[in-house]
């Protein structure tokens, strides 16, 4: 029997979205693309998990119960989490787009255009793999 080299780890995507249908659709789509998705329903459950990978990408819904997606990102950055992030939201107003841009985060409008979200996540992951 030949020893096979270990399978490379799939890139990690941390998804925080309180809508189960969105979370399921993103998880299914990204799984088909070879991405490893961990889903959380709100900011507090992600923060309590303490299980962030060293490398990966955050996909944060803006409209979360409790902390919104950008407040969650601020909290993570304050705790020295430097993973790239993508913000997803419905009907983003100009002030929200400005806040996301100031945080260095692309925003993708939902209903999700899966290709746009996948492109943004792949771009973020490519930057950390260099």
Predicted region positions:
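Alpha4 helix (beta4-alpha4-beta5 surface) of REC/receiver domains from two-component response regulators
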Residues: 71, 91-108, 115, 119
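Active-site residues of response regulator receiver
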Residues: 61
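Non-catalytic signal-transmission and effector/linker regions of two-component phosphorelay proteins
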Residues: 1-14, 20-21, 27, 77, ...
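Two-component/phosphorelay signaling modules centered on CheY-like receiver
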Residues: 20-38
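The feature encodes the CheY-like receiver
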Residues: 65
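Acidic, metal-coordinating helix/loop segments flanking the phosphotransfer/catalytic sites
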Residues: 39-57
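Acidic catalytic/metal-coordinating carboxylates
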Residues: 41-42, 68-71
């Amino acid at each position: 029997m030949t020893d096979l080299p270990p399978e490379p780890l799939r890139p990690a995507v941390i998804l925080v979205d309180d809508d189960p249908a969105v979370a399921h659709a993103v998880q299914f789509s990204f799984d088909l693309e070879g991405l490893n998705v961990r889903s959380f329903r709100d900011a507090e459950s992600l923060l309590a998990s303490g299980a962030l990978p060293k490398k990966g990408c955050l996909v944060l819904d803006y409209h979360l119960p409790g902390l919104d997606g950008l407040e969650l990102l601020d909290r993570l950055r304050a705790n020295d989490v430097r993973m790239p992030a993508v913000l997803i939201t419905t009907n983003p107003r100009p002030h929200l787009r400005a806040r996301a841009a100031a945080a260095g985060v692309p925003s993708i409008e939902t209903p999700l255009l899966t290709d746009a979200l996948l492109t943004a996540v792949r771009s973020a992951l490519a930057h950390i793999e260099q």
